[in-house]
């Protein structure tokens, strides 16, 4: 039973680790161009597209939940229809971004407010990379399908392939053709479409029979379209709450000065390290939870829930011990600024609480997606966001940055707690005792 979970989780963890490398590679290349404005342009551009990735992540999550249920039922035609529907909607939204490029660019630059010397380079990077949004969102639909049919190896291979293509193309455009920011952007663009093309090829090679069973009439069916948009709409709004909390966390850190901002940015990496692994088990919850829920195998479904939380508790213990013992050393690896390192010691105890505060939210998110209980995810995120802002508003004047970290950890903890309290009612309403 654990092997089934690990078979999904481990490739997903590898994929999660490779995703940030696309932006990191760009930063490393421009970091050797001798102009700080190039670095700023890439940082701003990467942040814009990371937000797009995050906000439209519902295309992957909603697809994986519905596909895993259809897969568990043995409904190959249903799986095919879900895939094509997600793919068409993802490509459609992506093309809308391309068509609305001037408006999106204006809004993004107004929000980010880059300095005058950075602005033209940031616009150049944006104007090239925006053409990759259709491939990026189309790939979300494909990845949701692959997770739904219990195959996370394909997304892993595609992620690794994308990074290799990005490195080769960006280096070639910059050092062989003499390009600057535009070369780095083109490398990213080529990598995105290369990954999308590889994913389509692997889809045809391994799951061609699924695609042949697709019915365009069923894809456009009103009831199924409504279900798709209801589920994904809930996840979309839920994601906006997450974005709002993270934006507030970063913005409040910035208001406290450069040192506190640096401390919060570096300490947040501990949460990121934890999330890479926990997201892998969340994906396993989506895949195996949805499969056994769709198949109506209640005993297996409950068993998978227990095993997932067993892995979650084990990882909490390991991460907590690792952070307590090695947290200071990790901070010194992340920065050599003595002032930042000294300031971080005051807040390091909050890092130790990250695993136990956040574990349940990750596991429940995967399971809720698997059974398409998206409204529960939305409600838990709403309640948690309210708690975050209340704690921040009430305690920040007296507690300062400690209040900000308390609010963030409570946001994670409350999400998991609310989902725990709602779970029994939800599964009973779905016919699972």
Model-derived regions: residue spans:
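Transmembrane helical elements of multi-pass membrane transporters/channels
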Residues: 7-26, 128, 139, 161-162, ...
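Helix-terminus/linker motif at the lipid-water interface of multi-pass membrane proteins
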Residues: 21-40, 109-116, 172-179, 240-273, ...
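N-terminal transmembrane alpha-helices
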Residues: 1-33, 47-62, 66, 91-98, ...
């Amino acid at each position: 039973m654990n092997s089934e979970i690990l078979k999904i989780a481990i490739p997903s963890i590898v994929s999660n680790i490779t995703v940030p490398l696309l932006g990191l590679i760009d930063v490393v290349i421009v970091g050797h161009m001798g102009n700080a404005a190039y670095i700023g342009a890439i940082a701003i551009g990467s942040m814009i597209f990371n937000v797009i990735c995050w906000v439209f992540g519902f295309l992957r999550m909603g697809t994986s939940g519905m596909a895993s249920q259809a897969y568990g039922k043995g409904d190959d035609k249903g799986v095919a229809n879900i895939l094509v529907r997600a793919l068409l909607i993802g490509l459609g939204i992506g093309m809308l971004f391309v068509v609305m490029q001037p408006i999106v660019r204006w809004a993004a630059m107004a929000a980010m407010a880059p300095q005058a010397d950075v602005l033209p380079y940031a616009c150049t990077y944006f104007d090239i990379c925006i053409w990759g949004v259709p491939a990026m969102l189309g790939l979300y639909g494909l990845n949701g399908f692959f997770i739904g049919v219990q195959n996370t190896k394909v997304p892993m291979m595609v992620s690794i392939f994308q990074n290799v293509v990005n490195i080769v193309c960006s280096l070639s455009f910059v050092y062989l053709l003499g390009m600057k920011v535009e070369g780095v952007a083109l490398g990213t663009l080529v990598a995105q479409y290369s990954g999308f093309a590889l994913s389509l090829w692997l889809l045809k090679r391994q799951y061609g029979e699924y695609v042949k069973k697709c019915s365009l009439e069923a894809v456009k069916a009103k009831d199924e379209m409504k279900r798709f948009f209801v589920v994904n709409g809930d996840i979309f709004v839920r994601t906006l709450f997450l974005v709002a909390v993270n934006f507030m966390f970063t913005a409040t850190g910035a208001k406290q000065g450069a040192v506190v901002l640096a401390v919060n940015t570096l300490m947040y990496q501990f949460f990121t390290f934890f999330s890479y692994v926990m997201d892998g088990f969340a994906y396993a919850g989506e895949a195996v939870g949805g499969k056994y829920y769709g198949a109506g195998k209640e005993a297996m479904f409950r068993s998978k829930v227990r095993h997932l939380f067993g892995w979650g508790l084990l990882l909490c213990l390991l991460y907590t011990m690792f952070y307590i013992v090695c947290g200071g050393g990790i901070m010194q690896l992340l920065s050599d600024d003595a002032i930042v390192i000294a300031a971080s010691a005051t807040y390091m105890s909050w890092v130790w609480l990250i695993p136990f505060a956040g574990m349940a939210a990750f596991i429940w998110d995967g399971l809720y997606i698997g059974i398409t209980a998206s409204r529960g995810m939305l409600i838990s995120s709403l309640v948690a966001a309210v708690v975050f802002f209340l704690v921040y508003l009430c305690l920040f004047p007296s507690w300062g940055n400690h209040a900000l970290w308390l609010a963030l950890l409570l946001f994670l903890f409350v999400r998991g707690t609310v989902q725990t309290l709602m779970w029994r009612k939800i599964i009973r309403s779905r016919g699972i005792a």
